[in-house]
Amino acid sequence: MDKKKLLYEFEKELEKKGISRRDALKAMGIATASTALLNPIETKASEAKASDVKAKIVIVGGGLAGISTAARLINSLSNPDVTVIEPSDVSVSYQPGNTFIGVGIYEKKDVMYELKDFLPKGVKLIKDKAVEFDPNNNNLTISSGERITYDYLVVAAGVALDFGRIKGLEELGNTYTMDEKSKIKELFDGTGVSTVYNTDAAVYTWKNMQATIEEAKKGKKLNAIFSHPDTAIKCGGAPKKIMYLMDARLNEVGKDVRANVNMTFYPNSMKMFSVKEYEDVIKEQYKQRNMNWKFAHNLKEVDIKNKVATFEHYWDEKGAWDPDLEEYDLLRRTKLVDVPYDFLHLTPPMKAPDEIGNSPIGSGRGWVPVNKETLQHVIYDNIFSLGDIAAVPLGKTGGSVRKQYKVVVDNIISAMEGKELTAKYDGYTVCPIITGIGSVMLAEFDWSMKPTPSFPLDPTKERYIWWLLKAYILKPMTQYGMLSGKV
């Protein structure tokens, strides 16, 4: 997709949302700058001669990471042989939009997209699931029993939402963001339990939030709590975004209504954010909004009937003196803490799908182990991985995928040509932290764990222009730019 077509999609999105001409002009200015600044190699790539090397490339996973990779391979090879294995019809749906569904800005239909409409021309689709891997013989098996061979394998299967680890939610087991067959409706609808990590659950998040607001309007004192688990998660800012947005929705109704709801964030970690500059600002924003936090709390159980969440709280105590190390031992202590709630937004533990995590291409922690720069498997040279499932220190965001898929494609072609893998992923990731309705802090950073803004503006400031970017520009850029392998 060329830039003119991409800008056309931006215009359609703005018209559909009915924003003012002034804001539309601002947004289009951001869109134009974004296509230039965020995609500096497009022109160079489009002018480069396609490689004549040939190999059978199989991609496991047909979401954003998998389809973007497939599209760029098609664009970069003169004789492409690319197969995508994906069981879902809606794998390319716009997952970042779930947060907006959870606060009534989007409807479910605004984020749902059919894979058939975005499958790159020339890519073969196997509508099934990879269940066994034999990397020593360059093949895998799908659930039908068919064995698929490959010369190169790309693993982009995303993450499973491990609700089953939370007592009280065992019947949900492992589910996925776009899974429409789970039992979430029965468990979440009208119970006060919510999450934006599943699209159907995001719908009930808004219903539960509205019910909480109605009760607060009656003068009732209520408790809203928000969890963050002890595993790596995709979009690490989402648990805070939904909290900011609930605060905004309550304040829309009235400051007195907001005052009736005590809001507390319970993360397992001891930090708000991994980059100090952003963490300092987030803490200050929480204080200004009268939003609380309690570190070192991991959600273990949800009693839906009695509306009680049980957390495991941990802390360290000084133990005995170690004469060899010349320091005191640290003793980890834990206790269970029951927290009553009226509204609970839970972020489920996440893991690699079992069929990958427990396979020879997985690792002790489940994620696919790769060199963090080349994204090549640490054991099998003809396997690459990217996106949420890759074991890299950062990178479980769509913004990371935008950088990673180009690295994977360039390095696969280099490997096919017998050349050194020179493309490097620098750890770039971005989290548009929605701090209110109309304000976003665009948190960009990389391996350095320092802010790395793409635009010459202070990245720690909340800005309306980043709201325009998040609300109106990023979705068409993702759906029509990245999925075509051009952005």
Name each model-derived stretch.
Residues 53, 442-487:
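C-terminal auxiliary extensions adjacent to catalytic cores
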Residues 77-150, 276-292:
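N-terminal Rossmann-like dinucleotide/flavin-binding domain of flavoprotein oxidoreductases
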Residues 389-425:
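A conserved FAD-binding loop/helix module that cradles the flavin
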Residues 170-218, 328, 337-401:
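FAD-site-proximal beta/loop scaffold in flavoenzymes
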Residues 1-20:
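N-terminal secretory signal peptides
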Residues 38-78:
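C-terminal segment of N-terminal export signals and the immediately downstream linker at the start
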Residues 79, 120-132, 247-365:
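A Rossmann-like FAD-binding core segment of flavoenzymes
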Residues 14-31, 38-54, 126-241, 245-254, ...:
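FAD-binding core/adjacent interface of flavoenzyme oxidoreductases
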